[in-house]
Amino acid sequence: ADSRNPLEEEFRETNYEEF
């Protein structure tokens, strides 16, 4: 997702449809 946000990258891949 975003290189500056490593956490967001994993979060986006797991709960993409929720948000």
From Swiss-Prot:
Posttranslational mods: Contains 2 disulfide bonds.
Single Gene Ontology MF annotation: toxin activity
Tissue expression profile of the protein: Expressed by the venom gland.
Cofactors required: FMN
Disulfide bonds: none
EC number: 1.4.3.2
Reactions performed catalytically: an L-alpha-amino acid + O2 + H2O = a 2-oxocarboxylate + H2O2 + NH4(+); L-leucine + O2 + H2O = 4-methyl-2-oxopentanoate + H2O2 + NH4(+); L-phenylalanine + O2 + H2O = 3-phenylpyruvate + H2O2 + NH4(+); L-methionine + O2 + H2O = 4-methylsulfanyl-2-oxobutanoate + H2O2 + NH4(+)
Biological processes annotated in GO: apoptotic process; defense response to bacterium; killing of cells of another organism; venom-mediated hemorrhage in another organism
Top-level EC class: oxidoreductase
Domain of life: Eukaryota
GO cellular component term of the entry, any: extracellular region
Principal place of residence: secreted
Cofactor annotation remark: Does not use FAD as a cofactor.
Keywords: Antibiotic, Antimicrobial, Apoptosis, Cytolysis, Disulfide bond, Flavoprotein, FMN, Glycoprotein, Hemolysis, Hemorrhagic toxin, Hemostasis impairing toxin, Oxidoreductase, Secreted, Toxin
Subcellular location: Secreted
Cytoplasm is among the record's keywords: no
Protein biosynthesis recorded as keyword: no
Similarity remark: Belongs to the flavin monoamine oxidase family. FIG1 subfamily.
Function: Catalyzes an oxidative deamination of predominantly hydrophobic and aromatic L-amino acids, thus producing hydrogen peroxide that may contribute to the diverse toxic effects of this enzyme. Is active on L-Ile followed by L-Phe, L-Met, L-Val, L-Arg, L-Leu. Exhibits diverse biological activities, such as hemorrhage (minimum hemorrhagic dose of 10 ug), and apoptosis. May also induce hemolysis, edema, antibacterial and antiparasitic activities. May also regulate platelet aggregation.
Assembly with partners or alone: Homodimer; non-covalently linked.
Protein name: L-amino-acid oxidase
